[in-house]
């Protein structure tokens, strides 16, 4: 598999967006990136790791129940706080990633998504983890990308969510 292309963040302003179980992977990215970054974290109700993120970036929180930060989702937090970025790195549930893809297209922001999927074999043979892609996959000869082998990180415009 692959990771986020850190070189794409050089000299740019970056959103690190995590939702639910997609939050922990973004913490390591916050540690590694040496650029201007803002972590936008989406929770159902209970916060975790936000204190750790504060060591490496500005942090904005959204909770579904409004118990902390912005009431709503990560895009609500971005809009409410007037945040801007050149690049998005995101990991979280598919509905969040779908919304971020649309937001990035609308605002012409480079967007990289780490897709969450069960991976049966982990080597691309079983095709249990495929997502629909814009291009024809050279392995399966259909519009698929194997998340375990070709991903899990994709440029948003390469995949259909």
Task: List each model region and its residues.
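FNR/FR-type flavoprotein reductase catalytic core
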Residues: 1-118
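C-terminal hydrophobic helical "lid"/dimerization subdomain
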Residues: 155, 160-161
């Amino acid at each position: 598999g692959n990771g986020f292309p850190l070189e794409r963040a050089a000299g740019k302003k970056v959103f690190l967006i995590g939702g639910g179980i997609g939050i922990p992977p973004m913490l390591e990215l916050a540690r590694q990136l040496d650029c201007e970054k803002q972590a936008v974290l989406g929770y159902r109700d209970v916060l975790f790791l936000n204190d750790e993120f504060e060591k490496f970036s500005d942090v904005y929180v959204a909770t579904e129940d409004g118990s902390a930060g912005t009431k709503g989702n990560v895009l609500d937090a971005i809009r409410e706080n007037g945040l801007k970025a050149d690049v998005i790195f995101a990991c979280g549930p598919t509905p969040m990633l779908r919304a971020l893809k649309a937001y990035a297209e609308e605002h012409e922001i480079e967007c990289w998504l780490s897709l969450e999927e069960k991976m049966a074999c982990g080597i691309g043979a079983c095709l249990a983890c495929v997502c629909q892609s814009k291009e024809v996959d050279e392995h399966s000869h259909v519009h698929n990308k194997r998340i375990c082998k070709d991903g899990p990180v994709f440029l948003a415009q390469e995949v259909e969510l």
